[in-house]
């Protein structure tokens, strides 16, 4: 991930030593939002406990900051088992995975974040481990090489990914419980902000909590981060209570607008609007123009803009919707207004209406 993105206020990537970790709920009943996912998990956990068996493998899918890691930790607590955590890029060799799996006890939970970044070789070792609870390793090299099978404790693999499409079908099919997490509503985030304020021993009004919640991009992690910055502002201003005025002033200073867009989002939208006349424009071109890696744009910037209806992804590239033009205070080009079919162009459409076409996008 790009260095600047790691430090971005509205980035949903967890920061090192992030104090918001202390705000995480410890049981499912305290977890706010994701109602359908919580209800289903509660049933699956109770069933596994009643059978005294390991819970089926779980795959969480969704943008960063929605609670995938928190739910994994809660699952281990509810099951009364140990929790082990790692991430896809960390598991570089077969020995790394073997060390993790052989140290698991019966019914333990192993959490792998960013599982889509596992190498194909590691995936091949993971298949029998998930299905048969066995490790099939090759010891030695050349003619002296031999296959060794190691029995494992029956464990639960909980994996998280922001990019479901990058998972191979064999790996994806081995998860018995796939769960998609969605962006939170403003009401849910408002409740989270009020809860966090109580934990901080900070007084906040309903309209103050609402102001923070509506700028949090549907993401609890961002809501907690914004609340901390508003608390800093209120402390320096000697405000006894965070109200809408204090929250608005603080967030405006941080250049977070009323829909939760920050300078990087606006750079993205302005680039497509002003340089490429609303698109279509390929993701590689956008990444080069913004000096940001493609993954950061696809995983961090675009999901919220798509959910809010600012942009559309097409086979030809990214296109701005009317909502984006209005938010930027710009007029859409006449060609966009006259040809709405540009937003839903079939693959066999005339290439003359395409402004920028990139085969590699």
Swiss-Prot record:
The cellular component terms of Gene Ontology attached to this UniProt record, alphabetical and capped at eight, are:
cytoplasm; Holliday junction resolvase complex
Which SMART domains does its entry note? AAA (SM00382)
Q: Give the subcellular location.
A: Cytoplasm
Region listing for Disordered, in residue ranges: 1-21
Which residues are involved in binding Mg(2+)? Answer: 69
Q: Where is this region: Head domain (RuvB-H)?
A: 258-361
Instruction: Please report a single Pfam family linked to this protein.
Output: RuvB_C
Q: Which residues bind DNA?
A: 294, 313, 318
Q: Does the keyword ATP-binding apply?
A: yes
Q: NCBIfam families from the xrefs? A: PRK00080.1 (NF000868), ruvB (TIGR00635)
- Description of its domains: Has 3 domains, the large (RuvB-L) and small ATPase (RuvB-S) domains and the C-terminal head (RuvB-H) domain. The head domain binds DNA, while the ATPase domains jointly bind ATP, ADP or are empty depending on the state of the subunit in the translocation cycle. During a single DNA translocation step the structure of each domain remains the same, but their relative positions change.
- Entries under PANTHER family matching the protein: HOLLIDAY JUNCTION BRANCH MIGRATION COMPLEX SUBUNIT RUVB, PTHR42848
Q: What is this protein called?
A: Holliday junction branch migration complex subunit RuvB
Species whose genome carries this gene: Bartonella henselae (strain ATCC 49882 / DSM 28221 / CCUG 30454 / Houston 1) (Rochalimaea henselae)
| Organism lineage string | Bacteria, Pseudomonadati, Pseudomonadota, Alphaproteobacteria, Hyphomicrobiales
